Amino acid sequence: MDQVEKPTRLPWWAWIRLPVFLAIAGAMMYPAARDFRRQAEHDVFAPSSSLVGIRRLSEYHSGLLMTPCNTEVYIFRGNEPGGKVLVLGGTHPNEPAGYVAAVVLMENLKIRKGTVFVVVPSNASGFSATEPQEAYPETYRIPLPGGGYRQFRMGSRFTNVLDGWPDPDVYLHYPSRQILSGNETRNLNRAFPGRPDGSRTEQVAYAITQLVLRERIDLVIDLHEASPEYPVVNALVFHERAQDLAALATLTMSTEGIDISLEPSPQNFHGLSHRELGDATPTFAVLMETACVVVGRLRGRTDADLVLLGNDPYYHAAARRGYVRVPYPENGIPMEVRVGRHMSGITALIDAMGQLYPEKGLEISGIPQFKDVVEKGVGAYLHLISVRPREKRQE
């Protein structure tokens, strides 16, 4: 009879290899997992004393409830009724001055008459990741005059792919049936007016459209940035209903030394906030663009300094050859110039609406203007934050 071989007895150290391997793998993965989780955390704000409530977009479209796109709607109201304004910041999360300008507005706004709604970040999902192959920094810090800093996220132009996967081969805009490339399905400024059963990005656009309708918003201001070589830059884009209002605002800005062009909203290019909100609602819909090298195609190294300073050697070379559409000074186009333009633009638009339509007038104060921001810096109008302020519900 063949003798049965006894199984070889493993040495003691063999029994602990798997637990040790798993422990080492877990320790290596923990920092990445921690950073991944942190990407879902929003920046912290300190709204002014004129804040009366904070809602969420899900209150205008329940489909966004319990999703990363369910961002806050900050409501500032005076003691007297008046016009209603909606400011969108962070529609494109890779355009930092549009986002920061909305934060500066909500942290400094004083209002006696009327109501101002601020949706920031408009595309919250887009701030949970940066854009592939763009080498954007994850964050940038704005120094405060008394010491310390405020840190803000840099995001992607598009909704996070995790909230919109997979992209179709072709994006068919609703309801125009305009055809765009597939990844534009995650571009919030190609999704208006949105639809309740569409993609996550279309649902965000739908919620904003419903906000405009339900709250009877008189004026929508969408804050953006564009590359210096882009044709529509340092511009105020307006729906035709807002033509007189936009023209008066640009005249006011010109008296402050701000060179800004007027651009009519194209009627055959759909999905844009100014086009679709103007068509789908009675509001005056406008969009402002400032020049930002971070979103340009000609830039070099893209780091936090470039976000803040806007000073790039390749753009200086391009400017000398006439390849850019705006003046590009020796010190670049820093954050304070870009944010300052937006702040003066917001004030000019609100004032223009009150002059042309007195029943829609607002009485506001506290908003820093272009010269103030350029002279003192953006940090002078941001608060040092140590804890997250408690949310207040609308009364």
What are the functions of these language-model segments?
Residues R77-K84:
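Proline/glycine-enriched tight loop/beta-turn segments at coil->beta junctions
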Residues H92-V100:
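Di-metal (Zn2+ and/or Mg2+/Mn2+) metal-binding site signature of metallo-dependent hydrolases
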Residues P96-A97, R112-L251:
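Active-site/substrate-binding loop(s) of hydrolase catalytic cores
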